[in-house]
Regions:
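Short, basic, glycine/proline-bearing loop/turn elements
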Residues: 1-9, 70-79, 212-217
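Active-site loop segments of alpha/beta catalytic cores
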Residues: 29, 76-324
Length: 324
């Protein structure tokens, strides 16, 4: 398309155009509308640094010098920050592809949002002032509920709570600080909103897979640092679906189309069963992933047996004229 990441994340027409092309080319069963964990942080006063080839990053933390909890009156609304653009794009996507594609509304998980607001001191706070951390996480969990309400009203089918920093803490700390807010959040989505939920985590979250399952999400998504077969065995005990975990850099970005097809075909071949399993990239895909590679990965899901039998030196053809 020739658009930068900043254009995609700030201009509705560019975003919708990109989403529709992704849907046409890759034919996904499920598709996020926006993968930007700084939406809430921006609304709540964090400064952002923008880039052409990735989502923005947080550059300042409003609670860095004060151990306070923001007023609930500051929680995002449909008019806050970039929310009007995002919600409009969600409604347009729901109308365009909602009959064939499950649409994911991605929000920033409580722990990562707390770190956006407080900065790295949040980790020391977990030892020095547990009550403050729990209060701040309570605010961030309320923010997640508010975002969920907005996304569900805009037609989203699945609420994905994305919390990369979960991989940075122990299972004991997870149970002390995160089990309660996450259990309540997923209960809220399941019982009060009748919505599906997903728990996205990045990094090596192996030690936390079981405690994540105990918070009762409908699904979990992990990246390449997790042994997905071992993680699936844990998830199966709790009847939680698991998604992942095509390597983002070595396979999707720097590999060939054949590498992507073979990785997915091999992954599926090692599963004891397909039930409760979602083939997906390990996390948000790098900006420069070749279109052919993602088409190859999708083809291996849609036509698994044909891909297994195919000679690996014959790539699937891509009509470049069809890529806008």
């Amino acid at each position: 398309m020739g658009a930068t990441a900043t254009q995609v994340l700030t201009d509705e027409e560019t975003l919708v155009r990109a989403l529709l092309e992704v849907n046409r080319l890759y034919k996904p069963d499920g598709q996020p509308v926006v993968f930007d964990l700084q939406l809430e942080a921006e609304v709540l006063g964090c400064g952002l640094v923008w880039a052409d080839d990735c989502p923005p990053s947080v550059s300042s933390h409003p609670l860095a010098d004060t151990m306070t909890v923001p007023c609930r009156c500051t929680l995002p609304t449909a008019e806050s920050g970039r929310m009007p653009m995002v919600l409009s794009a969600m409604r347009r996507m729901k109308e365009a592809v909602g009959d064939t594609t499950a649409l994911y509304g991605l929000l920033c998980g409580p722990f990562t949002l707390a770190s956006h607001l407080r900065g790295n001191d949040i980790f020391m706070d977990m030892f020095d002032d547990e009550d403050y951390v729990k209060d701040l996480l309570g605010f961030c969990a309320d923010c997640a509920k508010r975002m969920s309400d907005l996304y569900l009203d805009a037609g989203m089918d699945v609420i994905a709570v994305v919390d990369p920093l979960v991989s940075q803490i122990s299972s004991d700390h997870f149970e002390e600080f995160l089990s309660a807010p996450y259990t309540e959040l997923f209960r809220y989505l399941r019982e009060e909103k009748q919505a599906f939920s997903s728990f996205f985590v990045c990094g090596n979250a192996t030690r936390n897979i079981e405690v994540m399952c105990r918070t009762a999400p409908d699904s979990i998504s992990v990246d390449e640092n997790v042994d997905i077969l071992a993680a699936k065995a844990i998830c199966d005990k709790y009847n939680v679906a698991i998604g992942g975990n095509i390597p983002l850099t070595s396979i999707m970005l720097h590999g060939t189309q054949q590498d992507n097809m073979k990785f997915v075909a091999d992954l599926l071949a090692h599963l004891p069963e397909y039930k409760n399993f979602i083939v997906a990239p390990g996390c948000d895909m790098p900006y420069a992933v070749p279109v052919e590679n993602t088409i190859g990965a999708a083809q291996a899901v849609l036509e698994t047996e044909a891909v297994r039998e195919k000679r690996w030196n014959v790539p699937f053809a891509l009509d470049r004229k069809s890529v806008v």
